[in-house]
Amino acid sequence: MRKQPTVFEKLGGQAAMHAAVPLFYKKVLADDRVKHYFKNTNMEHQAKQQEDFLTMLLGGPNHYKGKNMAEAHKGMNLQNSHFDAIIENLAATLKELGVSDQIIGEAAKVIEHTRKDCLGK
């Protein structure tokens, strides 16, 4: 029996992640709701970490070597509105890259599972 494709595969695999992350951060860094969180961030390193994390989270190969989400976001006082902004920017990025609303929804559903850890709740 053939296994169902992962969200990572449905998105287009590593090439899609590699295309999406820079565009995603362009949107995030222009978003007044969240851009201040990245003021003193090495964005090259952040983008690599994000690409690896999203790849792993969405069902691709696990090359993520960063902190867990609770530790990575500890002390940032993130609120639901901040998490929502990130999801919205990612959805807009994927839409711009031609991903269907259905697959964007599938990705958002998987990412939603990290909300509590990211918000420290």
From Swiss-Prot:
Q: Name one GO molecular function term.
A: oxygen carrier activity
Q: What keywords is this UniProt entry annotated with?
A: Acetylation, Heme, Iron, Metal-binding, Oxygen transport, Transport
**InterPro entries, per the entry:** Globin-like_sf (IPR009050), Globin/Proto (IPR012292), Globin_bac-like_CS (IPR019795), Hemoglobin_trunc (IPR001486), Hemoglobin_trunc_I (IPR016339)
Co-factor requirement: heme
Chain coiled-coil ranges: none
Q: Which amino acid positions bind heme, per UniProt?
A: 73
Q: Which PROSITE patterns match?
A: GLOBIN_FAM_2 (PS01213)
UniProt modified residues of type N-acetylmethionine = 1
Question: How the cofactor binds, per note?
Answer: Binds 1 heme group per subunit.
Tagged with keyword Iron: yes
Tell me which family the UniProt entry assigns to this protein. Answer: Belongs to the truncated hemoglobin family. Group I subfamily.
The entry describes its oligomerization and partners as: Monomer.
Protein name per the record: Group 1 truncated hemoglobin
Q: Upper taxonomic classification of the species?
A: Eukaryota, Sar, Alveolata, Ciliophora, Intramacronucleata
